[in-house]
From Swiss-Prot:
Maturation of lantibiotics involves the enzymatic conversion of Thr, and Ser into dehydrated AA and the formation of thioether bonds with cysteine. This is followed by membrane translocation and cleavage of the modified precursor. It is found in: Secreted. This is Ruminococcin-A. Keywords: Antibiotic, Antimicrobial, Bacteriocin, Lantibiotic, Secreted, Signal, Thioether bond. The modification 2,3-didehydrobutyrine is found at residues 30, 39. The keyword Nuclease does not apply. Residues 1-23 form the signal peptide.
Amino acid sequence: MRNDVLTLTNPMEENELEQILGGGNGVLKTISHECNMNTWQFLFTCC
């Protein structure tokens, strides 16, 4: 039963979580291009 629950919840691995949250190398990969997280943070906090 535990294996069924884990399959249903689809747990993330640590490297996947770091990539989504912008950890690790600080680059967020998107479909069209790669954006540096610092660029996004600047755009949302500059004003």
